[in-house]
Amino acid sequence: MHIREYQQWLEEWDKERTWDKVLASHTLLHALEELGEVSKLIQIIEGYRAGEGVTPTQLQDDLALELSDLQVMLFKIAYLCGIDMETAMIRGQHKADARFPDPTTGPATRQSYWQHFRAYLAERGLEADPPA
């Protein structure tokens, strides 16, 4: 299925249930709720938050479903606002290629990120590397 086909399917599916009448601003609230669920799962996967009794496979499956739920809300906001996501995503690819045309600059950009991050922590008296 192509991106445009998915968006058209979603709009028709919503229309059959009259969910196409929900305001984009309210759909955004639902998207933020889904984003929170994605955030919680990533925190568990990365070890920042405890995940009692959940296997890595279950976490990955749950994350896939929550990402799908978030995608639904984003595609819904797009169709409610008259935006074709396939076109928008192609434009986004062109924007990224124009902004970062040379893939070899990735390591330098990443190194700069870490330098800024460590400086931020040092300015606040926080440790860059937690004690072992």
Annotate each language-model stretch with its function.
Residues 1-67, 71-132:
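Flexible "arm" and connector segments at domain edges
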